[in-house]
Amino acid sequence: MEAIKGADVNVPDAVFAWILDRNGGVKPLTDNDVIDSEHPCWLHLNYTHPESAQWLATTPLLPNNVRDALAGESTRPRVNRMGEGTLITLRCINGSTDERPDQLVAMRVYMDERLIVSTRQRKVLALDDVVSDLEEGTGPEDCGGWLVDVCDALTDHASEFIEQLHDKIIDLEDNLLDQQIPPRGFLALLRKQLIVMRRYMAPQRDVYARLSSERLPWMNDDQRRRMQDIADRLGRGLDEIDACIARTGVMADEIAQVMQENLARRTYTMSLMAMVFLPSTFLTGLFGVNLGGIPGGGWRFGFSLFCILLVVLIGGVALWLHRSKWL
């Protein structure tokens, strides 16, 4: 493949443009640099920036059918061979479990043995690990190593997020054992996060598996083996997601049962109270009619005797309920 002039890929508003130095480090791209398989370039763009969008639309270095994909139209994880290059779309979780489940960030990559062009709109936090390694001189040395390290970082972030969700589910299960019900909508949000993760991580695992089996010229056998390990690790994460989804279904049934039991207990308590006080209510209503005068109204102990009668009546009803094992 022909070498590329640095001036042809030096986009002014790029997030960064680096030359891999083959020793695990990078140096800033200049117009005088020559980009080839021995000195590959990583160009990272925000496709919403004007000059980056203009470069993506006009550069002859990219195939025509790649431009739209790099400009944000491709969202589902996939991998496509495009002549001498490869187009890869990946997803990464960026934040904590408090975010909405659709906060998965897309990153699109077109690469060959000379050039890596990656685009995004929102920042991909997983790339910070790769960038840090390159700045410290312990990063990837070539395009194949770069792709493996990026996929490894994305999988690490996904695994951490899945682990956080798993811990939340364990806490919910422990709380349910103590009859503590989560806030309204909490379990639904947790379940949706799991489902969205499952939706995008399953095809991403397939992307990793295909990259490990494709005979890409810029990947060696060791890098393919590492990519297969990453695919297997993400597959175990997907198994954990499936288990968590099933557990949230069980918890939803358990929450419904706890709420039903609480409602039944309250209804039962109110019914018992009504049964205890029903006779006394009848007597007070009967004596309060006052059509022929209140019985015992002229006797000074009449009210006291009536109160004693009510207490005895309530006690008798309560004793009957207790012996009947209702109370």
UniProtKB/Swiss-Prot annotation:
| GO molecular function annotations of the record | cobalt ion binding; cobalt ion transmembrane transporter activity; magnesium ion binding; magnesium ion transmembrane transporter activity; zinc ion transmembrane transporter activity
What keywords tag this UniProt record?
Answer: Cell inner membrane, Cell membrane, Ion transport, Membrane, Transmembrane, Transmembrane helix, Transport, Zinc
Say yes or no: keyword Cell inner membrane present.
Answer: yes
Reaction catalysed by this enzyme: Zn(2+)(out) + H(+)(out) = Zn(2+)(in) + H(+)(in)
Q: Which residues lie on this side of the membrane: Periplasmic?
A: 295-300
List residues in topological domain: Cytoplasmic: 1-273, 322-327
Q: Which residues cross the membrane?
A: 274-294, 301-321
Membrane topology value: Multi-pass membrane protein
Gene3D superfamilies membership = CorA soluble domain-like, Magnesium transport protein CorA, transmembrane region
Major location (coarse): membrane
From which residue to which does any coiled coil extend? none
Q: Which InterPro entries match?
A: CorA_cytoplasmic_dom, CorA_TM1_TM2, MgTranspt_CorA/ZnTranspt_ZntB, Zn_transp_ZntB
Looking at the keywords, is Zinc present? yes
**Cellular component terms per the entry's GO annotation:** plasma membrane
Q: Which HAMAP family match?
A: ZntB
Q: What does this protein do?
A: Zinc transporter. Acts as a Zn(2+):proton symporter, which likely mediates zinc ion uptake.
What is the name of this protein? Zinc transport protein ZntB
What species is given as this protein's source? Escherichia fergusonii (strain ATCC 35469 / DSM 13698 / CCUG 18766 / IAM 14443 / JCM 21226 / LMG 7866 / NBRC 102419 / NCTC 12128 / CDC 0568-73)
